[in-house]
């Protein structure tokens, strides 16, 4: 065994748990990108190489629309996830949930609830009012109905898998590519698992950021802010919106 090979094998093992939509939103806010245009495994490798960790697995979680919900994005995600799997990434995809949202754009609106136990009332506000999903009927004003597709359970899946990997001692470093505070209890539990098993796990919250003041997941041991220079080195040049790559 060469000294270089031995040195690599002795590096702390890292597993990347990537919240796809969280990563996209941060990249959009910070760098102006409107879709997932990077090689996620290359990004995880870049983070590990910078910190002298050995990446042993990359797991990517996202919600995917159906053909009926959005055929364009369905095609994109089918091709993108297929390429990830070819690259050795473990992909975990879930269906998006439909949610009907109604928005009213008037300041003075008489609102009558469908539930007769609630009396009619006049709302006076200086900002647009949101109509809840409990069946309110509007006597006046324009109502805009819109179906939005929401992602459910991604944070739970990441939390469960990250804790399972800790119990099985499959990593030394848990890389959570997310800033979702809902993952904070899982971070605490991973640390507790480490204490009970006499193992020391390092949990890092990783996200694109151009500002040093951005906060990641509470209770994480380390915050890693990905600068645009690192992000851009991991760009994926393939066009997954085309019918044929």
Language-model regions: role of each:
Residues 2-131, 143, 147, 202, ...:
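Domain-level signal for Mg2+-assisted phosphodiester chemistry and nucleotide/NA-binding surfaces
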Residues 99-245:
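Nuclease catalytic cores that cleave nucleic-acid phosphodiester bonds
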């Amino acid at each position: 065994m060469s000294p270089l090979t031995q040195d690599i094998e002795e590096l702390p093992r890292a597993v990347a748990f990537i919240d796809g939509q969280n990563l996209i939103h941060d990249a959009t806010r910070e760098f102006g990108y409107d879709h997932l245009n990077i090689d996620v495994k290359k990004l995880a490798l870049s983070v590990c190489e910078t910190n002298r960790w050995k990446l042993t697995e990359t797991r990517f979680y996202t919600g995917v629309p159906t053909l009926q919900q959005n055929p364009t994005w369905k095609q994109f995600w089918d091709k993108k996830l297929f390429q990830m799997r070819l690259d050795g990434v473990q992909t975990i995809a879930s269906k998006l949930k439909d949610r009907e949202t109604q928005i009213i754009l008037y300041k003075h609106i008489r609102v009558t609830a469908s539930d007769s136990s609630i009396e009619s009332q006049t709302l006076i506000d200086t900002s647009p009012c949101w109509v809840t999903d409990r069946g309110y009927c509007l006597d006046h004003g324009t109502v805009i109905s819109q179906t939005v597709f929401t992602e459910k359970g991604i944070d739970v899946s990441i939390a469960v898998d990250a804790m399972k990997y800790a119990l099985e001692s499959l990593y030394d470093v848990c890389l959570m590519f997310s800033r979702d505070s809902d993952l904070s209890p899982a971070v605490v539990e991973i640390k507790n698992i480490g204490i009970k098993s006499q193992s020391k796990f390092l949990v890092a919250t990783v996200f694109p950021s151009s500002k040093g003041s951005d906060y990641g997941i509470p209770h994480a041991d380390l915050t890693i802010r990905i600068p645009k220079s690192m992000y851009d080195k991991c760009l994926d040049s393939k066009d997954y919106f085309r019918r044929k790559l």
